[in-house]
From Swiss-Prot:
The keyword GTP-binding does not apply. It catalyses: hydrogen sulfide + 2 Fe(III)-[cytochrome c] = sulfur + 2 Fe(II)-[cytochrome c] + H(+). InterPro entries: FAD/NAD-bd_sf, FAD/NAD-binding_dom. Its EC number is 1.8.2.3. Signal peptide: none annotated. Dimer of one cytochrome and one flavoprotein. This is Sulfide dehydrogenase [flavocytochrome c] flavoprotein chain. It comes from the Bacteria. Keywords: FAD, Flavoprotein, Oxidoreductase, Periplasm. It is found in: Periplasm. It comes from Chlorobaculum thiosulfatiphilum.
Length: 48
């Protein structure tokens, strides 16, 4: 049958997981669950 994966949370970890699951196996059905409609961040903004 079809492989189905649900990823809960669309932060860095969730979005990356969903992306790479699809890249590794395009036949996987990946659903990303995230309540927010936009993702805004400034990674490493506090790095000195």
């Amino acid at each position: 049958g079809t492989k189905r994966v649900v990823v809960v949370g669309g932060g860095f970890g969730g979005a990356s997981t969903a992306k790479y699951l699809r890249k590794l196996d395009p036949s996987i059905s990946v659903t990303l669950v995230e309540p927010k409609t936009a993702f805004v961040t400034c990674p490493f903004s506090n790095a000195v």
